[in-house]
């Protein structure tokens, strides 16, 4: 039996290479989330307002808590997050099916 898949991070644009978020840091990001079939379910870009969250404290899905700290300020990356590190068996009714792999285009704007 193989180990379950974990969040994959593909850097699309390098950041400053030195300012990486640590657990407890407040991050400001822009993101677009899609399902594997390309259906968009959420986007801070569409709202025209970056999203802020505290990283590494369980405030967001596991895939963000593990993937975003691999980015430095100014980075843009694709996060591929397996269902068990996203919304799991419950999904997000009406938007995300149970155990769905989620794809996020994430840009790390700031770390406080």
Curated annotation (Swiss-Prot):
InterPro entries noted in UniProt: FKBP-type_PPIase, PPIase_dom_sf, PPIase_FKBP_dom
One Pfam family matching this protein: FKBP_C
Stored Gene3D superfamilies: 3.10.50.40
Cellular-component GO terms for this entry: cytoplasm
Membrane-traversing stretches: none
Residue ranges annotated for the PPIase FKBP-type domain, each copy included: 24-112
Renumbered residue ranges of the record's region Disordered: 1-20
Molecular functions per Gene Ontology: peptidyl-prolyl cis-trans isomerase activity
Main localization (coarse): cytoplasm
Record-listed E.C. numbers: 5.2.1.8
Record localization: Cytoplasm
Regulation of its function: Inhibited by both FK506 and rapamycin.
Catalytic activity line of the entry: [protein]-peptidylproline (omega=180) = [protein]-peptidylproline (omega=0)
Keyword list, A-Z: Cytoplasm, Isomerase, Rotamase
Listed Polar residues bias regions: 1-10
UniProt-listed PANTHER family: FK506-BINDING PROTEIN 59-RELATED, PEPTIDYL-PROLYL CIS-TRANS ISOMERASE
Family under the similarity heading: Belongs to the FKBP-type PPIase family. FKBP1 subfamily.
Function summary: PPIases accelerate the folding of proteins. It catalyzes the cis-trans isomerization of proline imidic peptide bonds in oligopeptides.
Listed name of the protein: FK506-binding protein 1
Organism of origin: Debaryomyces hansenii (strain ATCC 36239 / CBS 767 / BCRC 21394 / JCM 1990 / NBRC 0083 / IGC 2968)
Taxonomic path: Eukaryota, Fungi, Dikarya, Ascomycota, Saccharomycotina
């Amino acid at each position: 039996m193989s180990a379950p898949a974990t969040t994959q991070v593909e850097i699309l644009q390098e950041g400053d290479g030195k300012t990486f978020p640590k657990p407890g840091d407040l991050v400001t990001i822009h993101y677009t989330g899609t399902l594997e079939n390309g259906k968009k379910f959420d986007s801070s870009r569409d709202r025209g307002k970056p999203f802020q969250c505290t990283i590494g404290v369980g405030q967001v899905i596991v895939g963000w808590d593990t993937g975003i700290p691999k980015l430095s300020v100014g980075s843009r990356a694709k996060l591929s997050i397996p269902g068990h590190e996203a919304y799991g068996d419950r999904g997000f009714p009406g938007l995300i099916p149970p155990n769905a792999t989620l794809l996020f285009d994430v840009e790390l704007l700031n770390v406080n």
